[in-house]
Amino acid sequence: MSESIVHVSFSSAGGAGSVAKILSDEQARQGMKSSVLSVIRSDLRAAPLSAPLHTIAAGVDEYLVKSPGFRAPISLFRDASPGLESAIPSGADIIHLHGLNGAVTIDALTRVAQDRKVVWTLHDMNPFTGACHYSLGCADFVTDCASCPAVKAPFRGSVKRHLAKKIEAMGEIPGLSIVAPSTWLADLARKSATFRDHHISVIPNPVNPTYLQNEDDQVGDGREKGFRAMAIAKNLADPVKAIDIAVSAFHKATRGIGDAQLSLVGRGGETFAGHNINLRGQLNSRELAHELSHCDVLIVPSRAENAPLVIAEAAARGCIPLVADVGGMREMIMTLGHGVTFSNPEELTGLLEGQIKDRAQGKATDRRKVAQSARTAFSPEAIVARYGKVYEGRE
């Protein structure tokens, strides 16, 4: 493939930015001309001065615009912030969009996309809503978002106009291809007023190659110190990630078991500190891969998710994922053929008790089989091959 590809994402960290980098690195490894453009390397909470205008806009969205009772993030004023449009090389043949909020405005997108192939990987619902990143049951994105529950009443007109602008813009980009990492998100996008007339491909997100290395460590037992569980979130206090559910269920399931441990990975989490709770802070990929190799289960209790990479990453280390039955997570479990979904905290407690019992009786799932399933389904090589067909208009 001789065409040049530029991946665009507001941050090179987080889910969208990580996927952009993994794809670009693998494409470059295969000899393609591929690069990543991002505004910041971290996130606005961790490094607010890295993009001060975007930080202010994000603060306005969070504290002035968003309805206090709405638990998912929104982007409205942030979408109007100038970003990378002037930095996109004029010679790029393919523009591959990821996390667009604050990276490229909708108005600018229609200008830079002219006469070029545009691929947009959806990492949440925001590309086809007026503001929210997850609608949490609201279906207004099917029409016009006029009664948006995510924002305070004075801003609902702005949300409606923003969605109308997205709908109009998508009709002005002839070379646009849409990709969703899960059937769940693809189905919602197909129902939306924004992408109703577009073909949407479903391609899983790739696993960071770091989690596929050091196979002996990846599948080694290394769990001689008792039952080990882990929960991960960029911000452990994020209400959407619902880490409190994981902590509560773990305490109930391990009552009377002195050597069990739940590791919490991410920023904050001080309110969860207590007996058998290990606050690990933020870990890099290599550190996290090593820790997952020594965990029995990963708990993902989120109230809303698309297809979080951490599920495949944990499985690639032989760790069993226990995930809430929301978004595209059930589909990931079915693809892996390993792991379990739960519908409420009581079910999670029961699953943890079952894992502890199986481990004690020597019936734990073969970690090598779990790791091999993840490698087969989510390797960068396989995912890049799928995207190659999208670039060529064959998928």
Question: Language-model features: where?
Answer:
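Carbohydrate-associated surface elements
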Residues: 184, 206
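Nucleotide-activated donor-binding/catalytic signature segment of Leloir-type glycosyltransferases, i.e.
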Residues: 266-289
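Short alpha-helical donor nucleotide-sugar binding micro-motif in glycosyltransferases
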Residues: 290-295, 387
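Aromatic "clamp/platform" in nucleotide-sugar-dependent glycosyltransferases that forms part
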Residues: 303
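Short hydrophobic beta-strand element within catalytic cores of glycosyltransferases
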Residues: 320-323
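Conserved acidic donor-binding segment of nucleotide-sugar-dependent glycosyltransferases
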Residues: 335-347, 354-360
